[in-house]
Amino acid sequence: MERFARILSVLLLGVSPLAYASDWGTLNADAKKHLINLINIDTSLPEPDEISAARYIYKQFNKNRIDWDIFIPRKGRANLLARIKGTNPELKPLLLISHLDTASAGEGWTFPPYKATVADGRIYGLGATDAKNYTAVYLALFTWLKNQKSAPKRDILFLASSGEESGSETGLVWLSESHWNKINAGFALNEGGGIIRKTLGTDIVFAEASTKMYMDVKITAYGTGVHSSMPVNDNAVYLLSQALAKIAQYNPPAQITPTAQTFFKAIMPLQDEDGQTTIKFLLEGTPQNQQSAAEIMALDPFFRTQLKATISPTVLSASKDSNSTSGEASVLLNIRLLPNTDPDAFFTELQNLFKDEENISLEMVERPQTPFPTPMDGSDELFASIKNTAQKLFPHAITVPAMSPASGDNEFLRKLGVITYGLGPDMNPLEENTAHKPDEFISEQDLYGQLRFIAGIVFDFAYGQDLLPLQTEQPSAEETKPTIEQN
């Protein structure tokens, strides 16, 4: 493998070898190896074997003489924390965080979900993009940093957490209540953003500065349960389908949050004349013009998430027998609310859709925790490092704080006062976002690009140095051949 040249003149100026001697071939190979090995450990819901994934990670820590702590909220669940000490204890630590669990594997996979497959430049398997790629990237970078002679200015923490979104009661929520004194970070990088490629003629570096609020609502329809050979008109499934049709037709009003204002203002110069006019109405028009402009913008699926609440039916329940109808049928609606929404008012609005229907009931199964944390506004030093690194990697891109369509751990960190941004791999084309889909994958190029971006930010923020050269050196096939580790 060819190594990057070490520049003697830079050495003479006293710049740390960290600034230019990065061995991208080794780093890329390690990230790929870790991702493959982590995919091969089943950490899928509802009973994720996170302890086995944690065991794999702390074995890597042991090999590299890294101290670690493990926090186990209950059997099978685990949170693993490691630290690289900085030279200035007055600087608040930087936390690199990823979650160990994955969604369950649904139907339709052509590749084995629990065994990584490398094919056509892609790595297939459950968690490839949500979020074992983050764990693999952080682990490769963290172990490499520990073996360098120079220390960072501030502590760097790596937390492989248990659960996220509605599963955070074993992860960050639990840690914040029971073990936050072990973490006490001031800044954090997590999942949630990415690089949107050429959608509007240029690259957009999307730094997740806010999430949406997570809410589950259960709709239940009540009918008459009978033998299936003697059907009746008030079949609960038919009644539920009619209720779902109402939900499908419901169009939540648009809200223009401060984060959305920043995002649309940043992308306005990239639009054609019609697009610029629409965004101008959205940001500066009368309330009526704003709503009209929002409806036009919401035709784009991603823009819709920035302006409106979204509702997705997920779990259906009815009769368990093929020869009988149930007296009840229900569906769980997973709802992502804009951060300035009153959850109770939104729930009341949904209830009002069925106020004249006695056979339909709504229950808020999971309510968002309020008050919701204030979004990041991009005025802090961590965002400055994100922007500095993005300008080097993507010279013609714009870097903008924006809102993630999903929810996650970032809201819990922000509630603790931690300045938190979400960053990830390329997001384009958006149709190739395979998280929670059959044959989930990440391309090797995107994995290496994610590593390069995160490494550049860490160097800029924690070391106060450029990471040069920023261009990656691709590992050979032999270097990226995975070592499968048994747990």
What label would you give each PLM region?
Residues 22-126, 135, 145-154, 333:
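Acidic/His- and Gly-rich active-site-bordering loop/insert found
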Residues 89-90, 196-198, 255-320, 327-328, ...:
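An extended, acidic, His-containing surface patch that forms the Zn2+-binding/catalytic region
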Residues 173-175, 229-253:
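A short core secondary-structure module
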